[in-house]
Amino acid sequence: MENKPSVLTDKYDVGRLLGQGTFAKVYYGRSILTNQSVAIKMIDKEKVMKVGLIEQIKREISVMRIARHPNVVELYEVMATKTRIYFVMEYCKGGELFNKVAKGKLRDDVAWKYFYQLINAVDFCHSREVYHRDIKPENLLLDDNENLKVSDFGLSALADCKRQDGLLHTTCGTPAYVAPEVINRKGYDGTKADIWSCGVVLFVLLAGYLPFHDSNLMEMYRKIGKADFKAPSWFAPEVRRLLCKMLDPNPETRITIARIRESSWFRKGLHMKQKKMEKRVKEINSVEAGTAGTNENGAGPSENGAGPSENGDRVTEENHTDEPTNLNAFDLIALSAGFDLAGLFGDDNKRESRFTSQKPASVIISKLEEVAQRLKLSIRKREAGLFKLERLKEGRKGILSMDAEIFQVTPNFHLVEVKKSNGDTLEYQKLVAEDLRPALSDIVWVWQGEKDELTSQQETEYQQQQQQEQQEQEEPLKF
């Protein structure tokens, strides 16, 4: 590959070499506009075309665009010249996880953190039908905050790579981390193969060495095929049990990610993580309470009891009224499905749902609180007519949270918008479809998009309601 450019398309300064492979080199870069650090992967177009790998490059781009997750290296943009293809990616200052493990085994809590983040990333990719197929410490990077980032999707597979039997058939990956069914050149399930590799990574993090290793490659394959490994004496019993289930040579009986999350070792670490988070929240709240406890005149909290409730589920701000936002005709047009321009911008337009209701705002709020309690969601008021609902447990992409905002069209006619503010979009869609919609049915008049046109009965009801309210407004006051 020819010498690197010092500036890439007037957008990035290109700096030192970070690493290289057969067909590509990765350089440190910096955005000229924002000063943000990036990693720039330069691929020799001629080399990849000679060996027929251009489709693999295209697949890697597709996968990285699908797999947007906090624990997956983000692809910012792709550029190309006559001789090169450039991937501009998230820069991970901490380097490879391999470098940490090379110095020796990690503490249990540190190993748990990395394993937890790895499982979250892999689970998310699988939910998008993306299978990595080359999970190993060299492909797991660390950012500035020591958070894990899965990288190098060059060997990954999409669901459409499967044959008619529904299995993958390409042998790939690093031998010491590859599942037995992949080595045997049989069709394999990408999900199960990735779980095996995650099991090997977990062993390496806790032991500091590989579970399957031999100078003779065929002997190593034999050990992998029989799951012939010995756990060190310092491994806790619950870790041994989990590893035996992850490194099960039979893919049919190998543990699933859902069951990994339920394992005692995984839950124990999660419990410790939640305790730390709760402690941090209490510390933040105590600091905020100290600063908010006095006003400009040095007086304490007001006597009207307008502070947050003790249970923290419902927070009412002192300056906020209970009245929802009023909508005018232009607001309604902008919010209507027919005028929604979000689809033009290529984003997934499934992150929000709207419904209309003929119930008063107080009834809608009470119903939201009741449903939140039933679905084990926390709910708190942010401002007039706006509520934050959150799941108590982390999902594939962190805590799933959504905003429910009530808009007043008339005193007895409201529009409610439920919008995802954090977490996985697929989890949000499932929650809305399977839980929220049925639970809210008795206050919903119609969901947006459910019917393109209102039924004649609904139209008549709405017109009558509008006429009645107009008459009430026009009727002169009598003293």
From Swiss-Prot:
The activation loop within the kinase domain is the target of phosphorylation/activation by upstream protein kinases. The PPI motif mediates the interaction with the ABI (abscisic acid-insensitive) phosphatases. Residues 152-181 are annotated as: Activation loop. Residues 288-300, 457-470 have a biased composition (Low complexity). Its cofactor is Mn(2+). Residues 12-266 form the Protein kinase domain. Its EC number is 2.7.11.1. Interacts with CBL4/SOS3. CIPK serine-threonine protein kinases interact with CBL proteins. Binding of a CBL protein to the regulatory NAF domain of CIPK protein lead to the activation of the kinase in a calcium-dependent manner. It is an enzyme of class 2 (transferase). Keywords: ATP-binding, Kinase, Manganese, Nucleotide-binding, Phosphoprotein, Serine/threonine-protein kinase, Transferase. Residues 311-323 have a biased composition (Basic and acidic residues). Residues 286-323, 456-479 are annotated as: Disordered. This is CBL-interacting serine/threonine-protein kinase 10. ATP binds at residues 18-26, 41. It comes from Arabidopsis thaliana. Pfam families: NAF, Pkinase. The modification Phosphothreonine is found at residue 170. The active site is at residue 134. It catalyses: L-seryl-[protein] + ATP = O-phospho-L-seryl-[protein] + ADP + H(+); L-threonyl-[protein] + ATP = O-phospho-L-threonyl-[protein] + ADP + H(+). Belongs to the protein kinase superfamily. CAMK Ser/Thr protein kinase family. SNF1 subfamily. Residues 322-346 form the NAF domain. Residues 350-379 are annotated as: PPI. The modification Phosphoserine is found at residue 156. GO terms for molecular function: ATP binding; protein serine kinase activity; protein serine/threonine kinase activity. Induction: By salt stress. InterPro entries: Kinase-like_dom_sf, NAF/FISL_domain, NAF_dom, Prot_kinase_dom, Protein_kinase_ATP_BS, Ser/Thr_kinase_AS. GO terms for biological process: signal transduction.
